[in-house]
Amino acid sequence: MKKAKHWYDYLWICAILYFTLGFFNILFAWLGMIDFLLPLFLAIFGGNKYFCSHLCGRGQLFSKLGTDLKCSRCKPTPRWMSSKWFHYGFLLFFLTMFGNMVFQTYLVAAGAASLREAIKLFWTFRVPWGWTYTAGTVTDWVAQFSFGFYSLMLTSLLIGLIVMVLYKPRTWCAFCPMGTMTQSICKLKNKD
């Protein structure tokens, strides 16, 4: 008997839509804040990882590609990727990159730096992305945040796709920074 489908089983489409919209207009990168705030909100007020289990479009996309379309080798995830040290180390690295992005946005807002119309993949490789933004549409700091945030989201998607192909479809979920943060919140909340 087939499992009944729910509306949230199709959120993988939102992940594709997000990256497609950002390819044509960088300002759509702000929509990614939903994936940053909603898991934290649900963990704080719900005390669970409902977002990760049901609402994460990226995890669903990896399942769809890896399992349904057989793009994954389905090899076991290396133990070190599931270790506490790797989880928190990757989270710290990720938060450092996020903090740097926010700082760059601040510098643009303060007039101390100019807008960089480029995506940085893997926090290193500059990819010109200027066609996605028309100067003057919004203030420069709003655009700078968009470029930085889209860089972060696209880099994490690429990391997730790489580990999906090499290992199990949802290997990214084993060390996803949002999953690590929500897990920590749930542990703290359930101690009470």
How would you label these PLM feature ranges?
Residues 1-192:
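Non-ligating segments of multi-cofactor redox enzymes
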